Swiss-Prot record:
GO biological process: cytoplasmic translation
Key words, A-Z: Ribonucleoprotein, Ribosomal protein, RNA-binding, rRNA-binding
Any one GO molecular-function label of the UniProt entry: rRNA binding
Gene name as annotated: rplF
Protein's UniProt name: Large ribosomal subunit protein uL6
Length: 177
């Protein structure tokens, strides 16, 4: 059995989990999330904890039990605390502006880049060079953050561009004559 799947998922107060034959629904203070259930994993609920057991002894069932456990745990954390990604804009004249569900980026192009945020994702700009993306779905928060970063990824010679706040950019040395 997978090491990750051996750990049960604790269900905190205010979180409702409904396990149907094809879907797992998690509802909490920050919203509701759904996940398709895998046929290789048996999910049992007892005493406020969820346990994940492989349905058979195959390698795929063993691997999927750990994967399903972690996905459900991310859903529980998402509907209670939520997830966030911080991005920094580095460069002269680079700035961001949040306008409702849109993010307006001025990052050195001849035109501003306007990105619409999907439902369930909120964007904030505490400073003009900082963007905070929040939501209850970890995968969507990471995907939107990656799409914002892809507008102007950091370049290796000066480090200008949009980067994650915890990202380290190694600066290359320029060509010498």
């Amino acid at each position: 059995m997978s090491r990750v799947a051996k750990m049960p998922v604790a269900i905190p107060e205010g979180v409702e989990i409904a396990i149907k034959d094809t879907q797992i629904n998690v509802k909490g203070a920050l919203g509701a999330l759904a996940l398709a259930q895998n046929a290789h994993v048996v999910i049992a609920s007892n005493d406020g904890k969820l346990t994940f057991v492989p349905a058979n002894d195959s390698r795929q069932a063993n691997a999927m039990s750990g994967t399903m456990r972690q996905l459900v745990n991310n859903m529980v954390v998402g509907v209670t605390k939520g997830f966030q990604k911080k991005l920094n804009l580095v460069g002269v004249g680079f700035k961001a502006q949040a306008q409702g569900d849109k993010l307006n980026l001025t990052v050195g192009y001849s035109h501003p880049v306007v990105m619409a945020m999907p439902a369930g994702i909120t964007v904030a700009t505490p400073t003009p060079t900082e963007v905070v993306i929040k939501g209850s779905d970890r995968q969507r928060v990471g995907q939107i953050a990656a799409e914002v970063r892809a507008v102007r990824p950091p370049e290796p010679y000066k480090g200008k561009g949009i980067r994650y706040s915890d990202e380290k950019i190694t600066i290359k040395e320029t060509k010498k004559k």
